[in-house]
Amino acid sequence: MSIYSQLKQILIAKRCGAFALIDPDIKNDGALLETVEKINNSGFDAILVGGSLIQDNNFDTRIEYIKDNTNLPVIIFPGSSKQLSGKADAILFLSLLSGRNPQYLIGEHVESAPVIHSLNLEPIPTGYILLDGGNRSSVEIISNTIPLPMNKVDIILAHALAGQYLGNKFIFLECGSGASNHASATIIESLYSRLNIPIIVGGGITSSASAKLISNAGASFIVVGTHIENGASVEELQEITSSI
């Protein structure tokens, strides 16, 4: 069964799933095993691996290490076309719809597509929408794009619909790692009532209350990353995953 089919099965079994995000940078190597074990015991459905900037050439090695220490699907969440590995189970094939930088609308995709094909890596087309989470994110800086303001719900919806009509399998609302705010319930509800594809929401999710709010608004998957990296306990993470 494809990873995409497995994700759809998760949504049949329960209202909302949870992804754990691992930043596979050298600065996190010392805590990588502890992080993976924590994720394994916290009720997550899959692991996303990727970051805006990786400072060495060991992405493939870290993917293999994560795979060796978990039974969860490992999905690449790429910050660039260089973040590829045949050892992963799938890759979110991201188009940064909220920006107008052609490198992240099609450039990175053209560069990565032949490699993805040669690796026999399952691509999952995903429309990626960067929202203003209250502080300047690494995604904003690296991609040289401006996030959409959260009070412009109609503009966010238009981008999401465009992503759906282009054939994306998911819409990913992103406020950025360590965001002060997560995507609002108003935004999620607006998209949920009009889209026919699942919504992933990441950035600023640090409590069961925020996770439940996002889930109730219509998100299909939440993403927790910085909260894990900052030392959240298994019990705290279980509260989040069980609340949805």
List where the protein language model places each region.
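N-terminal amphipathic alpha-helix/helix-capping segment at the start of soluble metabolic enzymes
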Residues: 1-22, 26, 112-125, 132
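Catalytic cores of alpha/beta
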Residues: 34-35, 76, 80-93, 190-224
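Glycine-rich phosphate-binding active-site loops on the catalytic face of alpha/beta enzymes
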Residues: 49-54, 90, 94-105, 175-178, ...
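C-terminal helical cap(s) of enzyme catalytic domains, especially alpha/beta-barrels
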Residues: 63-69, 226-244
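Glycine/Thr-rich beta-alpha phosphate-binding loop at enzyme active sites
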Residues: 141-188, 228-231, 236
